[in-house]
UniProtKB/Swiss-Prot annotation:
Cellular compartments per GO CC: cytoplasm; nuclear speck; nucleus
SMART domains named in the record: HMG (SM00398)
InterPro entries with a match to the protein in the record: HMG_box_dom, HMG_box_dom_sf, SRY, SRY-related_HMG-box_TF-like
Domain of life from the UniProt record: Eukaryota
UniProt keyword DNA-binding, yes or no: yes
Function description: Transcriptional regulator that controls a genetic switch in male development. It is necessary and sufficient for initiating male sex determination by directing the development of supporting cell precursors (pre-Sertoli cells) as Sertoli rather than granulosa cells. Involved in different aspects of gene regulation including promoter activation or repression. Binds to the DNA consensus sequence 5'-[AT]AACAA[AT]-3'. SRY HMG box recognizes DNA by partial intercalation in the minor groove and promotes DNA bending. Also involved in pre-mRNA splicing.
UniProt family annotation: Belongs to the SRY family.
Quaternary structure (record): Interacts with CALM, EP300, HDAC3, KPNB1, ZNF208 isoform KRAB-O, PARP1, SLC9A3R2 and WT1. The interaction with EP300 modulates its DNA-binding activity. The interaction with KPNB1 is sensitive to dissociation by Ran in the GTP-bound form. Interaction with PARP1 impaired its DNA-binding activity.
Gene name of the encoded protein: SRY
Record's protein name: Sex-determining region Y protein
Keyword Mitochondrion recorded: no
Listed GO MF terms: calmodulin binding; DNA-binding transcription activator activity, RNA polymerase II-specific; RNA polymerase II cis-regulatory region sequence-specific DNA binding
Length: 216
């Protein structure tokens, strides 16, 4: 059931009433007739119709594959649509130029008709929405930044602490798995810190100068 909307319905009062009654009234859809400015009420669910979007003119392959796709689908009902497309693409490549020529001519005729019907048409492909990048949890980012700062400010302390923690963890694992005595030479050795190296150098210099070590 269609209702023609005349020019008086474009008054501000009528437009305001249409906005208020938008949730109750059926959705409004422009007709596809380019020579008419009327609108018609439909029983749609308010979603945008595909009739507003102008389709591209068919190329030679699409013209050829229309009947071929239907034929392959009837002969192979279990075949997926993606497999049918691959098969049609292979069959199209196997055709000779003479066999393809009628479909190129038909595509050219359809393109001319499309150009006359839609003179200002421009192909605008639909862009896929960008997927949001995965972000690290707040705790992980804070922990990573804190470890980076500590390693930058205290390089020797940070490395010594990591070495001690690794050594203690390996000792506990080895003691639980193998109760026998294991030589300490097999375990990773601790690297001396900067303070230990500095202290050893001072003791060595004092011994060479005075003949006996100085107590620090």
């Amino acid at each position: 059931m269609f209702r023609i909307v005349n020019g008086e319905d474009y008054s501000p009062a009528v437009q305001q009433r249409n906005i208020l009654d938008f949730g109750k009234a059926p959705s409004l859809l422009w007709t596809d007739n380019g020579s008419s400015n009327d609108r018609c009420d439909t029983g749609g669910n308010g979603r945008e119709s595909g009739q507003d979007r102008v389709k591209r003119p068919m190329n030679a392959f699409i013209v050829w594959s229309r009947d071929q796709r239907r034929k392959v689908a009837l002969e192979n009902p279990q075949m997926q649509n993606s497999e049918i497309s691959k098969r049609l693409g292979y069959d199209w490549k196997m055709l000779t130029e003479a066999e393809k020529q009628p479909f190129f001519e038909e595509a050219q005729r359809l393109r001319a008709m499309h150009r006359d019907k839609y003179p200002g048409y421009k192909y605008r492909p639909r862009r896929k929405p960008k997927r949001p990048q995965k972000l690290l949890p707040a705790d992980s980012s804070v922990l990573c930044s804190r470890m980076h700062i500590e390693e930058t400010l205290y390089p020797f302390t940070y490395k010594d602490g990591c070495a001690k923690a690794t050594r203690s963890r390996m000792e506990s694992q080895l003691s639980n798995s193998q109760p026998t005595n294991i030589s300490s030479s097999l375990l990773p050795q601790e690297h001396p810190s900067s303070w230990t190296i500095l202290r050893h150098n001072r003791v060595t210099q004092a011994t060479q100068t005075c003949g006996r070590p100085l107590l620090l």
